[in-house]
Curated annotation (Swiss-Prot):
<dbReference type="Pfam" id="PF25173">
    <property type="entry name" value="Beta-prop_WDR3_1st"/>
</dbReference>
<dbReference type="InterPro" id="IPR019775">
    <property type="entry name" value="WD40_repeat_CS"/>
</dbReference>
<feature type="repeat" description="WD 11">
    <location>
        <begin position="1240"/>
        <end position="1279"/>
    </location>
</feature>
<feature type="repeat" description="WD 3">
    <location>
        <begin position="904"/>
        <end position="945"/>
    </location>
</feature>
<feature type="repeat" description="WD 7">
    <location>
        <begin position="1072"/>
        <end position="1111"/>
    </location>
</feature>
<feature type="repeat" description="WD 16">
    <location>
        <begin position="1450"/>
        <end position="1491"/>
    </location>
</feature>
<dbReference type="InterPro" id="IPR020472">
    <property type="entry name" value="G-protein_beta_WD-40_rep"/>
</dbReference>
<feature type="repeat" description="WD 15">
    <location>
        <begin position="1408"/>
        <end position="1447"/>
    </location>
</feature>
<keyword id="KW-0677">Repeat</keyword>
<feature type="repeat" description="WD 2">
    <location>
        <begin position="862"/>
        <end position="901"/>
    </location>
</feature>
<dbReference type="InterPro" id="IPR054557">
    <property type="entry name" value="NA-iREase1_dom"/>
</dbReference>
<dbReference type="InterPro" id="IPR027417">
    <property type="entry name" value="P-loop_NTPase"/>
</dbReference>
<dbReference type="InterPro" id="IPR015943">
    <property type="entry name" value="WD40/YVTN_repeat-like_dom_sf"/>
</dbReference>
<feature type="repeat" description="WD 6">
    <location>
        <begin position="1030"/>
        <end position="1069"/>
    </location>
</feature>
<feature type="repeat" description="WD 13">
    <location>
        <begin position="1324"/>
        <end position="1363"/>
    </location>
</feature>
<dbReference type="InterPro" id="IPR011047">
    <property type="entry name" value="Quinoprotein_ADH-like_sf"/>
</dbReference>
<dbReference type="Pfam" id="PF05729">
    <property type="entry name" value="NACHT"/>
</dbReference>
Length: 1526
């Protein structure tokens, strides 16, 4: 049926729309839809006739256009010209008719007065018409072809693309692209060839016009071909060439027809052009002498006449072969975030590995998708970005050459454009001109490039955005990105590579590369292109093996694969070559770290490069030159230097010894032979890899500081012209190489170098102190330093100077110092010094005098204990934390800035929660109180008292009028917020209350308890109306479903139960867990339940059926906490394995493992918008994670020093303690002084033990290692690695030849002290091993575990001899009696059990503690047993009677460790209150209290500059003082 629509009415309706409306895209789309519906046009399915499509197009195109233009399209003559042009496959008819019409009528004058490009508007109208026509099918047709997109959105996108097209040729190219697709409404009988002919004609016309060729009036259009005549300028005249376009294959008959047309039209030449291919006969025919005026081309071959890329192709091929990428490339994996198109939040992640063809496979798909135009490839340094770029360019080049050889349509030509050499403020025209003209001598102007780009002929690859972006500030970087984005136009494909760590904040980097941050100038008009981001993954083991096998023998590869340090370094592709180069030194037993691998490799490379007959034949001179050149490149952001510029630099660096031309010639040849700088054909030198520059700069800094380690100094000592008879002396870096000629004209002879000494401050200010050190340089610099004193003297040299005189010298030196030794500055007088931008995090600054020092921009430790609980405010702007120090803190979510510190609790804060209006926060603590805090001021509004034991959980009612608290006193209390009164005490539970939860309307409260029940309480009556029974162990977690109809509970009985609220019945018992369930949580839609616990598995359950949908695995320790994202698509959890994991619910895949915590993760919370995740850990940090990128936005770090373990040395004169501050301390008993502090662990020290003769000490840590320390030297003798989780306990065997360690990885390892080898791994426990101990005769080993068992192992056979059962909670400590007849065990069930070794029976159960028993020890004579508990007491028991002799009070927090002196007269106890107490065993009295000083104890900050008052207050809390306080 024909669509009869009055165009006058359409124009009237369209022009009546107010202009402001059309500026908003959404409003414009809504307006268009309403107008279409007004004229009975279906917005999704246009009518299938010409008139209907024409009217539809007038609405889509016309909204916001001047009325005069719409009047033009209303004219019948224009409408008929449009129909004729399309029916005859000749779009140029329309443009010609429009010109004629405008010349002949007054409307033309009105339109021209608007100063708009008429032809452009006509072409834009035609483009919209084609797109509408493509959709003019039935809904069934549309669905069948899966064309489910919204039409008006698609057209809006096309119109926005057209707004980005600056030229008519660009619009013609876009029309050609659309015309290449069939559009049935236009020409129902049109063939595929006709559509191709239209596309070819449009591209050719655009190409000819871009080249400046004039088209004559002559045009022929037929079903299989079209003909034009073009005028090609030749000197002062032009050639007339007849062009015949053929959509299909050019055959011999086409050549004959061309010849006939050329003769008829009397042109100079004739060209046949095809999109497809040309037959052999046709090519042979035009080669004949009589046809020398004829030629035939594919369209690509036609382009070759004026765009010659052959020189570039030769360069690209040579560059790839030089890099050996064609031979040694190993496929790389990548990840890509999946973004919700509506919320713009990340909802998942895709990993592209072998099954998907790696990153190559994704880029192939991206190239084939016409909607995608730009992609950024991110990766850390050395992960293979440039490697991949040249590999993919090589792959694309082979495809291109193959198509070129076969004479078929070619794929895109890859153009690799490196950004390292361009100016700080980019101009894309200059970048392209530099690439085409300067680098590759390709004579293309910008118009020709633009046309090739729009026609889809190019693949643009910009490599190294980070190397350019690092030169500028944030806004200029954004401007530069958008400047490059100018080449992103319809039809283009652009790849950009960039270092991940370039961006100071991962979130900002993502936002920029996803085109979310706008430029301050040169913005793109209209809708931005579609941008994507991929991120390269580091090598896995198999990839490492593969790349090594390309370069080394199997035995060498296995040697590297077997070395964990080398394997970790080799995860970056850039390091594999260096490792192989350095292998001889590694095999010789030299130390291994990243800097030394560079050192060994660089030395071998330089030795190979040196030729004896050349001037620069010493390692030292070459090293100096490369260091200075690297510094110049990095500091000036000039990543390449032409050889012509080197003579001046050589003269400047080496003085008069190279003034003669022959010396420079020697240097020139020497440079051409070396391998660390790559020279191109133009003589430009660039580093083989940026990290080499960073290594040489780090070396230069270490030498200038006078702190270079001896093995690094050896390269500098390899100098020529030395007087070997003279004693070696110290030189400055610059002085050593400033050699002059002696009186005879020979290079002066100097004394050998002993070591480098520090440069003067003025010199350091221009190099080392020019800017804050980057992470890459710091990481390479630290292993090079072996002397603290020069750095200290440099800091002291800043005394009395101004900030401008020092720059970052003092701050950089201080940062390096404290990273090497966290205690090195203790007691130093640094008054009046200038220390700008230092990082003092977790550094001991005890008794440092900073009086009147300038500490601007320096970072210090915050006060923060183990973070036990985290909660976001309802608006997501704040989050709150509660920690083991009893402190509640408020933080700004956007910046990580600490806003308020709320003090009042005097013990652990276990739970925090915001009120619904976000104005208040409640906190529950081990101090038996609940506190209510004002969010705006941080003031404590009320303190709710009444509980008689720790408060484990607090929660506001939905209306925020009441607060519920659950406690270990077996009660739940309901508090009135306004009055502070306790409304009800819910009694009935006979065990600790672990969890409380309100239902949705606040009418009910559920509680889970250690008495194995769940209770449901009616708030109005305070009565318990249901007791849910069925669990057979304590209930740790309860939660209501979102509709309030069900309740879920997780228990230590290894089950989850679903309860029906209305009936009180158990709907399902969800079984599958093999250990206690710690956390349960419903998905936001209530369809699923997640559960996690000690079996290291998360299970997802279907609520309707009770079936386990799937299990999420990969954990190596307990799952402590679970939370769904607000949209329900992601599940986050915290674990005792120190990792936060994010799971995609739909794919069941782990999206991210968020690593960085060095202790258990106690709490995780999503922000209300789901964009940020906060995690709190026992490592005394809160980390904020960006969900979209998985990057850590902020680390909020603090400090406490719980004492986890104490032990006396064999003679009882010394006590060792292990602490949560990552240190081991030795204390002298008589003086109570701390003798020394052992540093090296990177997390809590959980256990310490002396060997039998007291010469060594072993320590086990949450960093998964055991360290062996020499008491006399305080040095670490060895680090035992192998455990995959915390090391909780260490023990020597009686003769000291072996060491046992128990770990959270559920194993016990036996180590040989002499060889440092692991002799045996004992397996059998199903949860953490908390304690290990040897029998007195050394034949057996006992272990206690969180699986509630004690196991007895045979040392000789490794077999488990016996398993002791009876405890009902974890076993935290085991110890043999001195005679070996009894084994004692302390447990979380609050008891100590004594077991008979001979019978395996329990002799006594010692009861009396009212909290966990974590540590036990026998007296030396075996008559007494001491036990330390979380109830803050130590108990002394008589072994023979089982009687408690004393209860020792004094600690104000959990007691973690107890130890007897060798004579049995003194008992030591270590506590979370940060003290060690010494007790008289006979009287039970406390003799002494040992307490380590606070981290900033006695630090004098009188009149210090550069710190805020809040920062000063924090420092004072950590021990700092001002004069008035001294």
């Amino acid at each position: 049926m024909m669509s009869l629509i009055n165009l006058d009415l359409v124009i009237s309706a369209v022009t009546s729309i107010a202009n402001p409306v059309i500026k908003e895209k959404i409003l414009r789309s809504e307006t268009v839809i309403k107008l279409l519906q007004q004229f009975n046009l279906d917005p999704e399915h246009p009518p299938a006739d010409f008139s209907g499509v024409y009217a539809y197009t007038l609405v889509e195109y016309g909204v916001g256009k001047p009325k005069a233009f719409l009047e033009l399209f209303r004219q019948e003559a224009i409408k008929q010209a449009f129909r004729k042009a399309l029916d005859h496959n000749n779009p140029s008819i329309l443009l010609s008719e429009v010109d004629t019409f405008l010349d002949a009528c007054t409307l033309g004058d009105e339109i021209r007065s608007l100063e708009l490009d008429v032809r452009r508007e006509v072409a834009a109208f035609a483009t919209v018409f084609i797109e509408v026509a493509k959709r003019s099918r039935t809904p069934a047709d549309v669905l069948m072809n899966q064309q489910i997109g919204s039409l008006h959105k698609r057209i809006a996108g096309i119109q926005e693309q057209l707004e980005r097209l600056p030229t008519l040729e660009g619009i013609r190219t876009e029309i050609a692209r659309l015309a290449a697709q069939n559009y049935p409404a236009l020409t129902p009988t049109a063939t595929e060839n006709q559509c191709r002919a239209i596309a070819l004609a449009q591209q050719m016309r655009g190409w000819f016009e871009t080249l400046g060729y004039r088209l004559e009036k002559y045009e022929i259009w037929a079903e299989e071909y079209f003909e034009w005549i073009i005028n090609v300028p030749v000197r002062r005249s032009y050639d007339r060439i007849l062009v015949r376009g053929v959509a299909g294959e050019v055959r011999l008959s086409d050549v004959m027809a061309l010849c006939q047309s050329v003769n008829q039209q009397k042109t100079d030449e004739g060209w046949l052009v095809s999109t497809r291919r040309i037959s052999r006969a046709a090519r042979d025919e035009v080669k004949k002498e009589e046809n020398r005026h004829l030629d035939c081309f594919t369209f690509d071959e036609l382009i070759d006449l004026d765009a010659d890329f052959s020189g570039y192709l030769d360069w690209l091929e040579a560059e790839i072969k030089r890099r050996k990428i064609d031979q040694k490339y190993v496929p790389l994996a990548c990840t890509k975030e999946e973004i919700d198109p509506v919320t713009k939040r990340r909802i998942g992640i895709s990993r592209y590995e072998a099954e998907d063809g790696w990153i190559d496979g994704y880029i192939d798909l991206w190239l084939d998708d016409p909607a995608k135009e730009h992609i950024s490839i991110l990766g850390e340094f050395g992960t293979g970005k440039t490697w991949f770029v040249f590999h993919y360019a090589w792959t694309a080049l082979q495809r291109y050459k193959d198509a070129q050889r076969r004479g078929v349509e070619r794929p895109r030509l890859p153009l690799v454009i490196t950004l390292r050499d361009f100016a700080k403020a980019l101009n894309v025209e200059n970048v392209l001109a530099g690439f085409f003209f300067t680098q590759h001598n390709i004579r293309l102007n910008s118009e020709v490039f633009d046309q090739l780009n729009r026609m889809g002929k190019l693949l643009l690859i910009f490599d190294g955005f980070d190397e350019m972006a690092a030169k500028v500030d944030r806004q200029q970087m954004i401007n530069n990105f958008w400047e490059l984005a100018k080449v992103v136009v319809p039809g283009s494909k652009v790849i950009l590579t960039c270092r991940t760590e370039h961006f100071p904040e991962a979130k900002e980097g993502r936002a920029l590369l996803n085109a979310e941050l706008q430029a301050s100038t040169n913005k793109l008009t209209g809708e931005t292109p579609q941008f994507e981001v991929l991120e390269l993954e580091k090598f896995n083991d198999e990839q490492i093996r593969q790349v090594l096998l390309y370069q080394a023998e199997e035995a060498t590869v296995e040697q590297i694969m077997g070395n964990s340090q080398l394997l970790d370094l080799a995860r970056r592709p850039v390091m594999t070559d260096l490792i192989l180069e350095a292998l001889p030194d590694i095999e010789a037993g030299k130390p291994i770290d990243m800097s030394r691998v560079y050192l060994y490799a660089v030395r071998h490379k330089m030795e190979r490069d040196i030729k004896a007959e050349r001037t620069f034949n010493s390692l030292a001179d070459k090293l100096y030159f490369l260091c200075e050149l690297s510094w110049e490149m990095l500091s000036t952001d000039q990543m390449s230097l032409n050889y012509r510029l080197f003579p001046e630099r050589i003269r400047r660096l080496f003085g008069s010894v190279v003034q003669e031309e022959k010396d420079l010639d020697h240097w020139h040849y020497d440079m051409m032979a070396q391998t660390m700088l790559v020279r191109n054909a133009d003589g430009d030198y660039t580093p083989a890899h940026r990290s080499l520059l960073e290594f040489f700069v780090a070396y230069k800094f270490a030498a200038e500081l006078g702190a270079l380690a001896r093995d690094f100094t050896e390269v500098g000592q390899a100098q020529s012209g030395l007087d070997s008879s003279t004693a070696s002396i110290d030189y400055t870096w610059s002085g050593y190489f400033s050699r002059q000629l002696d009186s005879t004209g020979c290079r002066e002879v100097i004394a050998p170098l002993r070591q480098f000494k520090s440069e003067f401050l003025d010199k350091l200010r221009e190099t080392f102190g020019k800017a804050k050190l980057t992470k890459a340089v710091i990481d390479l610099l630290l292993p090079m330093l072996d002397d603290n004193e020069p750095l200290i003297k440099i800091i002291e040299a800043t005394r009395g100077r101004t900030e401008d005189e020092v720059n970052y010298v003092g701050g950089n030196a201080a940062t390096l110092l404290v990273k090497l030794n966290k205690m090195v500055l203790e007691g130093r007088d640094l008054s009046h010094t200038v220390i700008i931008g230092a990082d003092f995090t977790n550094t001991s600054l005890r008794c440092v005098n900073f009086t009147e020092a300038n500490l601007a921009y320096s970072v210090f430790t915050k006060i923060l204990g183990s973070v036990l609980t985290v909660a976001f405010s309802p608006d997501g702007k704040l989050f709150a934390t509660g920690d083991s120090g009893g402190i509640v803190r408020f933080w700004e979510a956007a910046t990580g800035k600490e806003l308020l510190t709320c003090k009042g609790h005097n013990s652990w804060v276990n739970s925090v929660g915001f009120s619904q209006d976000g104005k208040m926060l409640a906190s529950g603590s081990d101090d038996q109180t609940v506190r209510l805090w004002d969010i705006s001021s941080g003031q404590c509004l009320k303190t709710f008292k009444g509980h008689t034991s720790r408060v484990r959980s607090v929660v506001f009612s939905p209306n925020s009028l009441m607060l519920a608290s659950g406690s270990s006193d077996q009660t739940v209390r309901l508090w009135d917020i306004s009055s502070g009164e306790c409304l009800y005490i819910f009694q009935g539970h006979t065990g600790w209350v672990y969890s409380v939860a309100f239902n949705l309307d606040g009418s009910m409260l559920a509680t889970g308890s250690g008495d194995q029940t769940v209770r449901l309480w009616d708030i109005s009556s305070s009565q318990c109306f249901y007791i849910f029974q069925g669990h057979t162990s304590c209930v740790r977690s309860v939660v209501f479903s979102s509709d309030g109809a069900m309740l879920a509970s997780g228990s230590d009985d290894q089950t989850v139960r679903l309860w029906d609220i209305s009936s009180g019945n158990c709907l399902y018992t969800l079984q599958g867990h093999t250990s206690c369930v710690r956390s349960v949580v419903f998905s936001p839609d209530g369809a699923m339940l997640a559960s996690g616990g000690d079996d290291q598995i998360v299970r997802l359950w279907d609520i309707s059926s009770g079936n386990c949908l799937y299990t999420l695995q990969g954990y190596t320790s307990w799952v402590r906490f679970l939370v769904f994202s607000p949209n329900g698509v992601t599940l986050a959890n915290g674990s005792s394995d120190q990792i936060v994991r994010l799971w995609d619910i739909s794919s069941k895949k782990c999206l991210y493992t968020l690593q960085g915590h060095t202790n258990w993760v106690n709490a995780v919370a999503f922000s209300p918008d789901g964009a940020t995740l906060a995690s709190g850990s026992g490592d005394q940090t809160v980390r904020l994670w960006d969900i979209s990128s998985s990057k850590c936005l902020y680390i909020l770090q603090g400090h406490t020093s719980w004492v986890n373990s104490v032990v006396f040395n064999p003679d009882g004169s010394t006590l060792a303690s292990g602490s949560s501050d990552q240190t081991v301390r030795l204390w002298e008993i008589n003086s109570s002084k701390c003798l020394c502090t052992f540093q090296g662990h990177t997390s809590w020290v959980n256990s310490v033990v002396f060997n039998p003769d007291g010469s060594m000490l072993a320590s086990g840590s949450s960093d998964k290692t055991v360290r062996l320390w020499d008491i006399s030297s305080s040095k670490c003798l060895h680090t035992f690695q192998g455990h995959t989780n915390w090391v909780n306990s260490v023990a020597f065997n009686p003769d000291g030849s072996m060491l046992a360690s128990g770990s959270g990885d559920q194993t016990v390892r036996l180590w040989e002290i002499s060889s440092s080898k692991c002799l045996h791994t004992f397996q059998g426990h199903t949860s953490w091993v908390s304690s290990v101990t040897f029998s007195p005769d050394g034949t057996m080993l006992a272990s206690g575990s969180d699986d509630q068992t004690v196991r007895l192992w045979s040392i000789s056979s490794g077999e488990c001899l016996y398993t002791f059962l009876g405890h009902t909670n974890w076993v935290g400590s085991v110890i043999f009696s001195p005679d070996g007849a009894i084994l004692a065990s302390g447990s979380g069930d609050q008891t100590v059990r004594l077991w008979s070794i001979s019978s395996g029976k329990c002799l006594y159960t010692l009861q009396g503690h009212n909290n966990w028993v974590g540590s036990i020890v026998f007296s030396p004579d075996g008559t007494l047993l001491a036990s330390g508990s979380d109830d803050q007491t130590v108990r002394l028991w008589n072994i023979s009677s089982g009687e408690c002799l004393y209860t020792l009070h004094g600690h104000i927090n959990s007691v973690r460790s107890v130890a007897f002196s060798s004579d049995g007269l003194i008992l030591a106890s270590g506590s979370d209150d940060e003290t060690i107490k010494l007790w008289d065993v006979k009287t039970g009295e406390c003799i002494k209290t040992l307490k380590s000083e606070k981290i900033y104890e006695g630090m004098n900050i009188t009149s210090v500059r550069g710190l805020t008052e809040v920062e000063k207050a924090t420092l004072k809390t950590l021990g700092a003082v001002e004069n008035r306080e001294i």
